[in-house]
Regions:
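Glycine/serine-rich anion-binding loops at beta->alpha junctions
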Residues: 97-112, 186, 319
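Acidic/histidine-rich catalytic neighborhood of metal-dependent amide-processing enzymes
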Residues: 106-175, 367-368
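Acidic/His- and Gly-rich active-site-bordering loop/insert found
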Residues: 1-101, 122-125, 366
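Short beta-strand segments
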Residues: 74-75, 132-134, 157-160, 179-181, ...
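Metal-dependent amide/peptide-bond hydrolase catalytic core
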Residues: 168, 175-368
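Short glycine/proline-enriched coil/turn segments at helix->beta-strand junctions
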Residues: 3, 40-44, 67, 122-126, ...
Length: 368
């Protein structure tokens, strides 16, 4: 078993369930301490930074001699829940795949980052190679927010799983609440009651129309179109009462070029008379396909893989958007596998090794 595979197995063994997703989840304190210790033992200047109680980032730097470009390698440590899984923290290797919670999303990418940084720690580079192992990507990304606010670099690579293709764009999202108001009354008094749930039905009809409109809009070349769906609905107290309120929570997935203001205007248009409020937003991400860091990853991927990687977009949101918004040219490149958030999750071990090799090669060139 290679050192990178041994490292990945140890990472999978550590419970790092995001406590915002699963009450009582372990959080990232233990895995951050392990990651910082592992990298510190291999010559990096490593530390743990608490972001919130029980929530931590591990930051490590292979310091250069000065005068070179810096490179930030970023991967998240938190994982989703394990309900229905059998032995989720006991990594199992079969047919070149490692099974276990987080193996694919995204401890495989984390292991690749750590291995690559360790490989260049004593390489005599001029520029810094910085590792940011971050918390909370699966919820609000408070870890990457901290990194974006406090660190900078000349480029960044996020190692979310891409199947060893080069990802240059991903979607964003907006969460919104819509609330309709009624008048509470006994179910026998239609002359007094106003049905807030029925009013929301009209909003849902409008939502279906908006979804169809978005599906027919001009697609982004890598991401397709934006979308919208109803996520949660609540209203009413009992069968024999007119409901005085109904709350709909929805998600609007966005593509580059769509803004929060655009989304809020669209939702307000289908919900006249209702209260509309955006509760959380993450912008989409896009980097030019000919950006220097994209070209470097593409070139070294060809050398390592013996094939030309595809240039792709990703439907899900990633921490890349936060780094890009902070002014750091960012690209996404990571291992292959399947089962993110699923009962059966695995990562291809050869792809983890090759990802680490590409990252190392990019760092040696970029930070020379």
């Amino acid at each position: 078993m290679s050192e990178t595979t041994e490292l990945l197995a140890r990472l999978v063994e550590i419970d790092s369930i995001n406590p915002e997703l699963v009450p009582g989840g372990a959080g990232e304190a233990e895995i951050a301490a392990f990651a910082a210790g592992w990298m510190g033992e291999r010559g990096l200047d490593a530390r743990v930074e608490e972001v919130a109680p029980g929530r931590a980032n591990a930051i490590a730097t292979a310091r250069g001699s000065g005068g070179g470009r810096s490179l930030l390698l970023c991967a998240h440590m938190d994982i989703v829940g394990v309900e229905g899984m059998d032995a989720p923290f006991e990594p199992r290797i079969e047919d070149g795949r490692m099974h276990g919670r987080g193996s694919f999303d995204m401890k495989g990418g984390l292991a690749a980052v750590m291995a690559a940084a360790a490989a260049v720690a004593a390489a005599g580079l001029r520029g810094d190679v910085i590792v940011a192992a971050v918390c909370d990507e699966e919820y609000e990304s408070i870890g990457a927010e901290r990194v974006a606010a406090e660190l900078t670099a000349d480029a960044a690579i996020v190692t979310e799983p891409t199947g060893l293709d080069v990802c240059v764009a991903h979607k964003g999202f907006v969460w919104l609440d819509i609330e309709t108001a009624g008048v509470a009354a006994h179910g026998s008094r239609p002359d007094l009651g106003v049905d807030a749930i029925a009013a929301m039905g009209e909003v849902l009809v409008g939502l279906s129309g908006l979804a169809a409109q978005l599906a027919g809009s001009r697609p982004h070349p890598l991401l397709g179109t934006g979308s919208v769906h109803a996520s949660l609905i609540e209203g009413g107290q009992e069968l024999s009462s007119y409901p005085e309120r109904c709350l709909l929570r929805l998600e609007r997935r966005t593509v580059p070029g769509e803004t929060l203001a655009d989304v809020e205007a669209q939702i307000a248009a289908i919900a006249p008379g209702a209260a509309v409020r955006s509760t959380f937003e993450r912008a989409p991400f896009e980097v030019a396909a000919d950006a220097a860091i994209v070209s470097a990853v593409h070139r070294h991927a060809i050398d390592v893989l013996g094939r030309e990687p595809a240039t792709v977009g990703h439907a899900a949101w990633m921490d890349a958007a936060l780094l890009s918004a902070a002014g750091i040219p960012t690209v996404v490149f990571g291992p292959a596998g399947a089962g993110a958030h699923a009962v059966e999750e695995w990562v291809d071990l050869d792809s983890v090794e090759r990802c680490a090799q590409v990252l190392e090669a990019v760092a040696r060139e970029w930070c020379a």
